[in-house]
Amino acid sequence: IVYDSEAHACLIDGARMHMGKRMTYRHNDYESCEKTIQRATRLCEETGGGILLITEGVYGMTGALGFLDKIVELKKKYKFRILIDDAHGFGNMGPTGRGTSEHFGVMDEIDLYIGAYAKSMASIGGFVAGPKKIINYLRFNMRSQIYAKSLPMALVEGGLKRLEIIRSKEGDELRQKLFTI
């Protein structure tokens, strides 16, 4: 696992639970990221396995954008998977509010996308989007998912209404207003 040195604590905790090698790169530093990916690639060539790069779309503490467009260039060069935590970008970034990967035009290159309802939707809960095989694995193997209760229907209905707003002309206007503040 390769991740930004200033990734959110939940991402760092998740990475620490992984049994494999973990490597960090300097915060939002393209050259450091590439050097770390090169090291990870050499290690994978020696031992087998693959690389998962974990980053954030918008860093919550600073508001800085992750360099997703450049990370996708590295992905094409070094053949790894990308997980993006876009809790702060979902609903706010991109022409239709689909997040930071939409903002950079790289949505189809993101392998796992994590969004939260707590930020732009002022609610609770979140989601993971990705290939069906991976999502099914998560659904049936994550203890936090297996023993969790579903969201209350009022929150689900409220979330659907908020998604309608995000996708509407009003949502477009609200996103424009957000960036003028």
What is each model feature region?
Residues 6, 58, 86-88:
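Conserved Walker B
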Residues 66, 157-181:
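Conserved PLP-dependent catalytic core of the aminotransferase class-I/II
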Residues 102-137:
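Active-site PLP attachment segment
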Residues 17-19, 109:
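Short, structured coil segments at secondary-structure junctions
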Residues 124-125, 142-151:
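A short glycine-threonine-serine/GTX helix/turn-capping micro-motif
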Residues 23, 27-83:
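Active-site phosphate-binding strand-loop segment of PLP-dependent enzymes
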Residues 1-9, 179:
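Conserved PLP-anchoring active-site segment centered on the Schiff-base-forming lysine
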